[in-house]
Curated annotation (Swiss-Prot):
Region (Essential for determining substrate specificity): 254-277
A GO BP annotation: lipid catabolic process
PLAT domain segment(s): 352-486
EC category: hydrolase
Entry protein name: Hepatic triacylglycerol lipase
Coiled coil: none
Swiss-Prot/TrEMBL catalytic activity: a triacylglycerol + H2O = a diacylglycerol + a fatty acid + H(+); a 1-acyl-sn-glycero-3-phosphocholine + H2O = sn-glycerol 3-phosphocholine + a fatty acid + H(+); a 1,2-diacyl-sn-glycero-3-phosphocholine + H2O = a 2-acyl-sn-glycero-3-phosphocholine + a fatty acid + H(+); 1,2,3-tri-(9Z-octadecenoyl)-glycerol + H2O = di-(9Z)-octadecenoylglycerol + (9Z)-octadecenoate + H(+)
Glycosylation sites noted in the Swiss-Prot or TrEMBL record: N78, N397
Gene3D superfamilies xref list: alpha/beta hydrolase, PLAT/LH2 domain
Gene field: LIPC
Subunit organization: Homodimer.
Active site: S168 (nucleophile), D194 (charge relay system), H279 (charge relay system)
Length: 499
């Protein structure tokens, strides 16, 4: 998108997007009918769409002109290197956004993997009513396809070495470009960064970015939260791998819950900044993968964010996890995969994912809803008092699974300090319950027992089981903290000891 002002206007377009103007539908024409473009439109596009190549990260871009081979040499095009082309999205103010230059600089700062870096500048055609820009997107896609085919004819260059990176509406431009490439082979890769939703959600594969448009298509979804049935970013999968950071609905640090306060302070611009933050997060996650090669974010295949939040999807066998961003493992699939991950609110965005499974025995008939914290001690670092939310009361004998994320690498986990954090008032209630228990029952059988803590580290795939440091006292009481260490005994023996 263009300036901060464009997002509220974008939402206004979303609200009206299914209406008609002067009796004409705003929905794009079907793929087959759009393929025939008049000579007048082609001539117009050739003057309005610019292809820029960047010699270095500080360069403002050198224009490559279709059918002018001399411009390839002037702009420093190296046919032996891959070509990465950035495609911007819809614009209201007609200005290119600052993230473009950040991505150019990040791509040019890869000494181990040098590439040609280009930009599809279609700002004059993107600077239109949204529905008009959608129609223009298909035409611009044709121009990009024409450029790539000309490059193959003009230089010893293969389309398989092309990587198109499209943001918002630009993601669909990239998809159209791939679909218009004629011949047996496809372009190498397309990355869709929060591909635009309005006028594309629910359409056929030929009318949007899809896995058919390149040998490998990956997509990052960061703002799929619906407003009146529409979302800024497309929700449906559009690639071989579709990544949904933090569920894809919204992003941490974008302060959506404080929107009304921001509007009171900053006016309508607060709305634009809040929504732009989540939509554009896809761009910054991708740039982050370039700037921090040693801190790549891993995502995991899962059915939905609720299951992922329970820690149920941290497996990597059979290709069930992959790296988000530029360094993704490229595996074209017959059936696409949806992957989830948690990120921080700012760069570097990487977190470390852990699944915890805790088995409780509650010997009080009434379900308990205590508050817990865990402190994790690793070989490198430790994390203190991480709050634990089970989401339901503790019943007689049940195992609870949940996800914990850490913003630093603690190394190999060695000790877990588990604490019942309830207040002194709760402790008094607990003591009262203990008092009214029939005298015939032993005190040690009248409480909450924590049997084992099982842990799986997503990033290392390591599995660990922790047992109480004091096997003679397994009871846990309010305000009490217990240490758990790696189990030295067989879990089956532990079960016998507890009975």
């Amino acid at each position: 998108m263009g300036s901060p002002l464009c997002v509220p206007i974008f939402l206004a377009v979303c609200i009206l997007i299914q209406s008609s103007t002067h009796g004409q539908s705003l929905r794009p024409e079907p793929f087959g009918r759009r393929a025939r473009v008049t000579a007048t439109k082609k001539t117009l596009l050739e003057t309005e769409t610019r292809f820029l190549l960047f010699k270095d990260k500080a360069n403002k871009g050198c224009q490559i002109r279709l059918h002018h081979a001399d411009t390839l040499q002037e702009c420093g095009f190296n046919s032996s290197l891959p070509l990465v082309m950035i495609v911007h999205g819809w614009s209201v103010d007609g200005l290119l956004e600052s993230w473009i230059w950040q991505m150019v600089a990040a791509l040019k700062s890869q000494p181990a993997r040098p590439v040609n870096v280009g930009l599809v500048d279609w700002i004059s055609l993107a600077h239109s009513h949204y529905a008009v820009a959608v129609r223009n997107a298909r035409l611009v896609g044709q121009e990009v396809a024409a450029l790539l085919q000309w490059l193959e004819e003009s230089a010893p260059f293969s389309r398989s070495n092309v990587h198109l990176i499209g943001y918002s509406l630009g993601a669909h431009v990239a998809g159209f470009a791939g679909s218009y490439i004629s011949g047996k082979h496809k372009i190498g890769r397309i990355t869709g960064l929060d591909a635009a939703g309005p006028l594309f959600e629910g359409t056929s594969a030929s009318d949007r970015l899809s896995p058919d448009d390149a040998t490998f298509v990956d997509a990052i979804h960061t703002f799929t939260r619906e407003h009146m049935g529409l979302s800024v970013g497309i929700k449906q999968p559009v690639g071989h791998y579709d990544f949904y950071p933090n569920g894809g609905s919204f992003q941490p640090g974008c302060h959506f819950l404080e929107l009304y306060k921001h509007i009171a302070q900053h006016g309508l611009n607060a709305l634009s900044q809040t929504i732009k933050c989540a939509h554009e997060r896809s761009v910054h996650l991708f740039i982050d993968s370039l700037l921090h090669p040693s801190m790549q974010s891993t995502a995991y295949q899962c059915s939905d964010m609720d299951s992922f939040s329970q820690g149920l999807c941290l497996g990597c066998t059979k290709g069930r996890c992959n790296t988000l961003g530029y360094h993704i493992r490229q595996e074209p699939l017959s059936k696409g995969k949806r992957l989830f991950l948690v990120t921080q609110a700012q760069s570097p965005f990487r977190v470390y994912h852990y699944q915890f499974k805790i088995q409780f025995i509650n010997q009080i008939e009434k379900p308990l809803e205590p508050t817990f914290t865990m402190s994790l001690l690793g070989t490198k670092e430790e994390m203190q008092k991480i709050p634990i939310t089970l989401g339901e009361g503790i019943t007689s004998n049940k195992t609870y699974s949940f996800l914990i994320t850490l913003n630093l690498d603690i190394g190999e986990l060695m000790v877990i300090k588990f604490k019942w954090e309830n207040s002194a008032v709760w402790a008094n209630v607990w003591n009262t319950v203990q008092t009214i228990i029939p005298w015939g029952i032993k005190p040690r059988n009248s409480g909450l027992i924590l049997k084992t803590i099982r842990v799986k580290a997503g990033e290392t795939q390591q599995r660990m089981t922790f047992c109480s440091e004091n096997m003679d006292d397994l009871q846990l009481h309010p305000t009490q903290e217990k240490n758990f260490v790696r189990c030295e005994v067989n879990p089956k023996k532990l079960k016998l000891k507890i009975k």
